[in-house]
């Protein structure tokens, strides 16, 4: 894995990804909750 490339992508798109994630959190929040509950 090229971490430099990942950092560059995150630097460029990080804000957009965060905005998108917040806008669509209802799509993945139940999945994350289920996943976390299974791990705990």
Curated annotation (Swiss-Prot):
**In which tissues has expression of this protein been reported?**
Expressed by the venom gland.
Q: Does the keyword Disulfide bond belong to this entry? A: yes
- Provide the coiled-coil residue spans: none
Keywords of the record, alphabetical order, are:
Disulfide bond, Membrane, Secreted, Target cell membrane, Target membrane, Toxin
Q: Name one GO molecular function term.
A: toxin activity
| Signal sequence bounds | none
Q: Would you name any one GO CC term?
A: other organism cell membrane
Report the sequence similarity comment from the record.
Belongs to the ectatomin family. Ectatomin-Eq subfamily.
The molecule here is called: U1-ectatotoxin-Eb1a subunit A
The source organism is: Ectatomma brunneum
């Amino acid at each position: 894995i090229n971490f430099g490339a990942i950092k560059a992508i995150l630097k460029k798109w990080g804000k957009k990804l965060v905005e998108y994630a917040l806008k669509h959190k209802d799509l993945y929040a139940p999945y994350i909750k289920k996943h976390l509950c299974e791990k705990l």
